[in-house]
Amino acid sequence: MKKLTTLLLASTLLIAACGNDDSKKDDSKTSKKDDGVKAELKQATKAYDKYTDEQLNEFLKGTEKFVKAIENNDMAQAKALYPKVRMYYERSEPVAEAFGDLDPKIDARLADMKEEKKEKEWSGYHKIEKALYEDKKIDDVTKKDAQQLLKDAKELHAKADTLDITPKLMLQGSVDLLNEVATSKITGEEEIYSHTDLYDFKANIEGAQKIYDLFKPILEKKDKKLSDDIQMNFDKVNQLLDKYKDNNGGYESFEKVSKKDRKAFADAVNALGEPLSKMAVITE
């Protein structure tokens, strides 16, 4: 009987040991899988960091040309550069939170500054936009504002390498930006003097889509249907924007966009934002 008991105990321990080995193997597989996802997220974030660096580099180059046009009193050249240069900044806007105080210095609207009772501190592209498109003049104040803009653009460019960009910021930033496009930018409030809003919209969509493209391989492993839904909605938004392309590779004035199309665009961006907000599943 003692031998039988000993034999049964040995068998139980052997089975338990085998079970523990299987559990360890499963844990090991899960750990390796998690490590793989973390590595992919890190790689995608690094790639977006590089993309942001490139956009801010081009933004600085464009701003230098823009400021030179202001210094030369070249109104036509300044207006031609204005929307195109701003696109580099707008593509980076999903992570503008990381820009700190430089974001309002470069991109604040007068309405926002008035709301905060800081209109005397107003600076940046939109202040110069008002001078070019509403006041229709370049004076000493405009030139001073242009020099300050260039200084801020240089500071942002220098800061690019130290920006704290994370997957969470990228994902949340892209969703928040699309929400802003659909609810407030769609009214024309961003480019209230120049009506070059469609350039901004296109750049905002491109910035958000870059984030999706970089995370797409990870998302497809987690939820292929969600990934396909996001891609389909990006395509719909871009098709609506394409309707208002001009013959020079740019976009028509936002004033030419019908109320029907404005609503269609807002609805399309909202429809895109809904599945895009679920993309955080890749970090789980």
Curated annotation (Swiss-Prot):
InterPro entries, per the entry: EfeM/EfeO_iron_uptake, Imelysin-like, Imelysin-like_EfeO/Algp7, Imelysin_sf, Iron_uptake_EfeM/EfeO
A GO cellular component entry from the record: plasma membrane
Keywords for this protein: Cell membrane, Lipoprotein, Membrane, Palmitate, Signal
S-diacylglycerol cysteine lipid attachment residues: C18
The UniProt record lists the keyword Transmembrane: no
CDD domains hit by this protein: Imelysin-like_EfeO
Residues carrying lipid (N-palmitoyl cysteine): C18
Superkingdom of source: Bacteria
UniProt-annotated location(s): Cell membrane
Signal sequence range: 1-17
Record membrane topology: Lipid-anchor
NCBIfam families membership: EfeO
Family: Belongs to the EfeM/EfeO family.
Protein name from the UniProt record: Efem/EfeO family lipoprotein
